Amino acid sequence: MTNPSTINILISNDDGIFALGVRTLANTLAQAGYQVTVVCPDRERSATGHGLTLHRPIRADIVEDFFDPKITAWSCSGTPSDCVKLALSSLIENRPDFIVSGINHGSNLGTDVLYSGTVSAAMEGIIEGIPSIAMSLASFSSRQFQPGADFACGLIQQLYDHPLPDSTLLNVNIPPVTADAIAGVMLTRQGLRRYIENFEKRFDPRGKSYYWLAGELVTEIEQPDHIHLPSHIPTDVQAIQHNYITLTPLQYNLTDVASFEYLQTNQWLERSRDIK
């Protein structure tokens, strides 16, 4: 087994620097011997996707007395993706062996990953060629972060000794149960979740209207047969309901290979050239 003290880890999140999830993760990894640096938003930045700060300055400040003394921690005024970019370019001296984003307070399952600042911070690492993991606790009410943090220790060792293919992000969701109630670990495909969007119209004290987004989760929708993996492989949404830790490999290349091949073999391109 590789000595953890030789492995450098950069941790970020979208819940903010003072979130319990990132504190539990960072302290657990540091106490296991890993070299840990934390760079997180200075406040909650959930559902910011892969947004970047382009029109105002980004500020970063050292955070003391919140994490294990062995950890160097920074708060950043930008988005989760800003945090990773700034860390790699300006804040840390040594290129990390891994980037871990989380542990998010709430799941990142199915199409949630498209909106997730947690996943985007990890994806920024993949874009930079660094093995990266996004970790989420699949509940907004539970505070059972320790099982996920403990799992991260072993997962990083495994990925260090047996790396994933390049450009592969591992999206991990942890069921909100005690360690002894976790059913196991399951490799899953990304599910498809949709929400009934409800923009509630409200009025401020000056009588000016504004809108507040609220959403109600719709039961998971099955994906079309041509999308990537056969339906007998469980989705992350299905597996988490049975208390499995889900491992879903993701990538930043969004090319739809099946549709590309369909367009190649059905004279679609030739016909499109005749469109006026």
Curated annotation (Swiss-Prot):
GO CC, any one term: cytoplasm
InterPro entries xref list: SurE, SurE-like_Pase/nucleotidase, SurE-like_sf
Record protein name field: 5'-nucleotidase SurE
Biological function: Nucleotidase that shows phosphatase activity on nucleoside 5'-monophosphates.
Cofactor: a divalent metal cation
Residue runs in coiled coils: none
Leading EC class: hydrolase
Organism for this UniProt entry: Crocosphaera subtropica (strain ATCC 51142 / BH68)
EC number, as in UniProt: 3.1.3.5
Keyword match Ion transport: no
Subcellular location: Cytoplasm
Details of cofactor binding: Binds 1 divalent metal cation per subunit.
Nucleotide-binding recorded as keyword: yes
Pfam family, one: SurE
Chain residues that bind a divalent metal cation: D14, D15, S46, N104
A GO term for molecular function: 5'-nucleotidase activity
